[in-house]
Amino acid sequence: MKILVIGSNGQLGRSLLTSLARPYPGTIFWDRQALDLTKLGVIRARLENLGPQVIINASAYTAVDQAEQETALALAVNRDAVGEIASYCAAVDAVLIHVSTDYVFDGAASAPYVETADTNPQGVYGASKLAGEQAIAASGCRHLILRTAWVFSPYGQNFLKTMLRLGGERDTLSVVADQIGSPTFAGDLAEAIVATLKPVREGDCAWGLYHYAGDASVSWYEFACEIFAQAQHMGFSVPDTVNAISTSEYPTPAPRPAWSALDSSKFTGVFGQPSSDWRAGITTCLQALGQLSK
């Protein structure tokens, strides 16, 4: 089974490098130099030349605020390029495993979102990701779409690494406390994707849309406090004070859903992979970052 991962330099892509190494050692990894998703005219030809049987799309335009000024670019990567990949898969009966986002929801819920919940993205980023999901469904290809949320890892830019950087620079931090989500360790998300590959290979997969995210509904403030509690124990510099603030006190160009926690129970029931243990994920990240700093 020839597997291709698109987006090998991102948080998920780098985590997949580790998770796929032993069970699927022949996996091919493409970064942006190997396949630039903004160049729509070359995507189909590149895929046809390689001939993958399974494509894991771990790449996306994820600059949530910048997307408000770069609508065309966000749509090109998150909708049009995804449509090209799905079209290839449909033509050759390949499988597409695609990662989407909690930002397809408006945040009006009060319980974790299930897959059948109504979508209503509030910004360009969420709208572009939803359009990508729709393009996959319209293609008719065999697919798995995994919506996830608040991804963090030792790699790239993410909330955990931002908190550690700011915590080492400032005595006091203010963090939004009225946005609720499900922090997801990228290593767990990678393992969840690996868990789908056995039924994919055996042709006995329940295709469709799934949620996979952290096992709790917490605020950014609570997330930050847990990061700093663990970081202090491991010898990282942390702020003296972390203040809880409202979204209105920290305006951003793109609106964020006030509630975007995801219910992973469908995925766990089908594929047997438990939802991400976000606290354990923080521990793993901090240990890795501590080793990198030595």
Regions found by a protein language model. Give the residues of each.
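N-terminal Rossmann NAD(P)H-binding glycine-rich loop of SDR-like oxidoreductase domains
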Residues: 3-20
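NAD(P)H-binding glycine-rich loop region in Rossmannoid oxidoreductase-like domains
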Residues: 40-79
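NAD(P)-cofactor binding segment of oxidoreductase domains
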Residues: 69-97
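Catalytic helix-loop patch of NAD(P)-dependent Rossmann-fold dehydrogenases
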Residues: 76, 81-84, 104-146, 150-152
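NAD(P)-dependent short-chain dehydrogenase/reductase
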Residues: 134-181, 187-195
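Substrate-binding strand-loop-helix patch
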Residues: 154, 179-190, 210-230, 284
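Mid/C-terminal beta-alpha module of Rossmann-like enzyme folds, strongest
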Residues: 199-251
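Amphipathic terminal alpha-helices
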Residues: 277-294
